[in-house]
Amino acid sequence: TDLKQKERYDRVDDAVCAVRSALLEGIVAGGGVALLEQSQRLSPVSLNDNHPKEYRLAARVLATALEAPFQQIITNAGIDSERVMDKVMDKGVKGYGFNVKTREYGNMLRQGVIDPTKVTKSALRNAVTVATTILSTNAIITSARTYESN
């Protein structure tokens, strides 16, 4: 059908763009692992009393936000994200994560679970921009929420 053909075209186009991006700036461990690793780099900053209180708080907030993609991917696979995240963080090996497709722990790069560096950086940069805008705004207009009653 036309819809399936358009969807297939979009997937191929996305793949081509991802490869181009990877060729430009390289790749990082996928599955949220690269962002999870960066969240760990912020822990010393958030605990260091030499930094102002606001700086430490911002580091904690950003670290928590960087953990979210990894946790969401694991949760979407129907797995306890806290348990998996603890195991990955305890291992402390660069690129080590959990492959939800094979349900195995290991090196994400070797398993082919990758993200283009440029895409990861752009997503993070855009998220920080949106968060900064929200935090510096007095009011925000969003879509109305609908609540379902049980």
Where in the sequence are the language-model features?
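Extended, low-charge hydrophobic alpha-helical regions
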Residues: 1-150
